[in-house]
Design a protein with these regions (language model features):
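Helix-loop junctions and terminal segments of transmembrane helices
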Residues: 47-64, 126-127, 236, 240-284, ...
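Hydrophobic alpha-helical transmembrane segments
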Residues: 102-112, 135-182, 198-199, 347-355, ...
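Interhelical loop/hinge segments that connect adjacent transmembrane helices in multipass membrane
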Residues: 136, 174-214, 254-271, 390-404, ...
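Interfacial segments at transmembrane-helix termini and the short loops linking adjacent helices
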Residues: 89-108, 274, 290-321, 327
Length: 472
C-alpha cells in the first residue's frame, strides 16, 4: 500500500504541477485542442477494449500463453486504433467544429500503440501487489512528461503537451521491461483467450457507455461554446478529479485483487468493503474541503483567461465525494466476477448524465456540464446502494466517529488553507495553502483518533496488511 500510494500520489502531484504550469503559459484554446484529441483516442480505445488486463488479474491461474495472447491482442488493437485515428482525424475535428485539432489527434494517435507495446508482465505485478516495482515504472514517466512539456511550452505551444505525453508514454513502456521482467511473444492461439474474453466483454460495453457521456458533454460544449470553453472545462475537470483519481487508484489497486481472492466469502468481503470505504472517506472529505475552499484562489493564480473555472471545480469536488462509493463498488463487482453489474451501474450514471447534460449546459454554460456529473453520480450512488444492500452491511463504514473525524479535519483543512492564501496570494501561496491545509487535516485526524479511541489504527493496519500479504 505504501508504494502504491507513493506511485499514485507522486504521479498525480507531478501531473498537477505540469497542468498548472502549462495553464500559466498556454491559452485555454490549447487545452481545448488536447481535450478533443484525448477524447478521440479514448473513444476508439473504449470501443475496442476487451478487458484483457482486468481478466488476467481476476483469473486465478492465468498461463504464460494467455499473457502473451493478451499482449498480442492489445498490440493489434492499438495498431488498428492508431491507423483509424490518423484517417478519421479530419472528420472528428469537423464534428467538434475545431479544424486545428486534426494534426493534434493524428499525433496523439500513436499513444495507444506505445502503451500497448509495454510488457504484459505489469498485469502480474498488479495481481501480486508488487507496487514498488510499478512505482519505479510510472514516476519516471510522469517526470519526463513534465520536463518535456514545460521546457517546450514557450516555443511549441500546444505541441509541447503532445511531445510530453508521447515522451512519458515511451518512458513508461521502456521501464516496464526493466521492472516486469517478462518479454512477451506474439501469440495467435486465441482459443486460450476465450475465458478472458468472456469476462472482458462487459468491460468493453462498460467502457463504451462511460465514454459516451464524457464525449457527448464535451461535444456539446465545443459546438455551442467553443474550444476555449472546452479548455476551461477540461482543466477544471482534471484538477477536480486529481484527488479522487489518486485515492481511488491507491485503494482500487488493492481492492480489485483482494475482492477477487475473497470471492465466495461474503463475510470477509463485507468487512473488506467497509474498511476500504471508511479509509477513502476519511482521506477524501478533508482533501475536497480544501479543493472547495481554494478553487477561487486557483482561478486567481492562473489569471483572467481561466475565469469561471472555480464553480466548475467546486461542483465536481462535491460530485467526486459522492462518486467514491460508486468507484469502490465497481472494484467489488469486477473482483467478484460481476462485470455485468458494473455495466448496469455505469449505464445508470451515464444515462442520467446524457439526459440532463444538454438542458443544464444550455441553462448554465460550462458549469452545467459539472452539474450533469453531479446528478449522474447521485443516480449511480442510489442504484449502487440498491444492489449492495443485501450483500454488504454498511453501517460500520459510515461509523459516526470516523465521519465526525473526517468532517472536523475538513473544516480545519479549509480554514488553514484559506488563512494561508489570504496572507500569501499567488501560485506559491496556493501550494503553501494546500500543504498547510493537509497538515491541519492530518493533525486533527490523529488528535481525535487518540482522544476518542477511534478505529483509525485498525483501518490503516488492515489496509497495509492486505496490501503486503493479500488475503489468506
Amino acid at each position: 500500500m505504501r508504494w502504491r500510494a507513493v506511485q499514485l500520489v507522486g504521479v498525480e502531484l507531478v501531473y498537477l504541477l505540469r497542468l498548472l504550469v502549462l495553464a500559466r503559459i498556454l491559452l485555454p484554446e490549447a487545452f481545448g485542442l488536447i481535450a478533443i484529441a484525448v477524447t478521440s483516442v479514448g473513444i476508439l480505445m473504449s470501443v475496442s477494449e476487451v478487458g484483457m488486463v482486468q481478466a488476467l488479474v481476476q483469473a486465478p491461474h492465468a498461463t504464460r500463453e494467455q499473457y502473451d495472447g493478451a499482449w498480442t491482442v492489445g498490440l493489434l488493437r492499438a495498431a488498428v486504433v492508431t491507423v483509424a485515428l490518423i484517417a478519421a482525424a479530419p472528420v472528428i475535428a469537423h464534428l467538434f467544429d475545431v479544424a486545428d485539432a486534426t494534426p493534434i489527434i493524428q499525433a496523439l494517435a500513436f499513444r495507444p500503440l506505445i502503451d500497448a507495446a509495454a510488457s504484459i508482465g505489469v498485469a502480474r505485478l498488479t495481481k501480486e501487489l508488487h507496487f514498488r516495482r510499478l512505482a519505479m515504472m510510472q514516476l519516471p514517466a510522469a517526470v519526463v512528461d513534465l520536463l518535456v512539456a514545460v521546457t517546450l511550452a514557450g516555443s511549441l505551444g500546444v505541441w509541447a503537451i503532445v511531445a510530453g505525453t508521447l515522451s512519458g508514454a515511451l518512458t513508461s513502456t521502456l521501464a516496464s521491461y526493466a521492472v516486469a521482467r517478462h518479454v512477451p511473444r506474439l501469440s495467435f492461439r486465441f482459443a486460450d483467450l476465450l475465458p478472458l474474453i468472456r469476462y472482458g466483454r462487459w468491460i468493453l460495453i462498460t467502457g463504451i457507455v462511460a465514454l459516451a457521456g464524457t464525449t457527448l458533454t464535451q461535444l456539446i460544449i465545443s459546438r455551442s461554446l467553443g474550444a476555449a470553453a472546452l479548455g476551461v472545462y477540461f482543466l477544471a475537470l482534471k484538477v477536480a478529479f486529481l484527488p479522487s483519481t489518486a485515492a481511488s487508484a491507491v485503494v482500487g489497486a488493492v481492492a480489485f485483487p483482494i475482492f477477487a481472492q475473497l470471492r465466495g466469502e461474503p463475510e470477509r468481503t463485507s468487512a473488506a468493503f467497509r474498511q476500504l470505504l471508511a479509509g477513502l472517506l476519511l482521506v477524501l472529505i478533508p482533501v475536497y474541503a480544501m479543493v472547495f475552499v481554494l478553487a477561487p484562489s486557483l482561478e486567481m493564480a492562473l489569471g483572467a483567461k481561466w475565469a469561471a473555472t472555480s464553480p466548475i471545480i467546486r461542483i465536481i469536488a462535491v460530485s467526486c465525494v459522492i462518486g467514491v462509493f460508486g468507484e469502490l463498488l465497481v472494484q467489488l463487482m469486477l473482483g467478484q466476477g460481476r462485470s455485468d453489474a458494473a455495466f448496469r451501474l455505469e449505464l445508470v450514471q451515464t444515462g442520467t448524465l446524457v439526459v440532463v447534460a444538454w438542458p443544464l449546459i444550455s441553462a448554465f454554460g460550462v458549469a452545467g456540464a459539472a452539474l450533469a456529473w453531479l446528478v449522474g453520480n447521485l443516480a449511480a450512488a442510489i442504484g449502487g446502494l440498491h444492489w449492495l444492500r443485501r450483500r454488504v452491511q454498511l453501517r460500520e463504514a459510515v461509523d459516526f466517529g470516523l465521519t465526525a473525524c473526517a468532517a472536523a479535519a475538513a473544516a480545519g483543512a479549509g480554514f488553514a488553507a484559506a488563512g494561508i492564501w489570504q496572507a500569501w496570494p499567488g501560485m506559491a501561496g496556493l501550494f503553501a495553502a494546500g500543504i498547510c491545509g493537509a497538515a491541519a487535516a492530518v493533525a486533527i485526524v490523529l488528535l481525535l483518533a487518540h482522544l476518542f479511541k477511534l478505529r483509525l489504527d485498525a483501518v490503516i493496519a488492515w489496509m497495509r496488511a492486505r496490501a503486503e500479504r493479500g488475503p489468506a
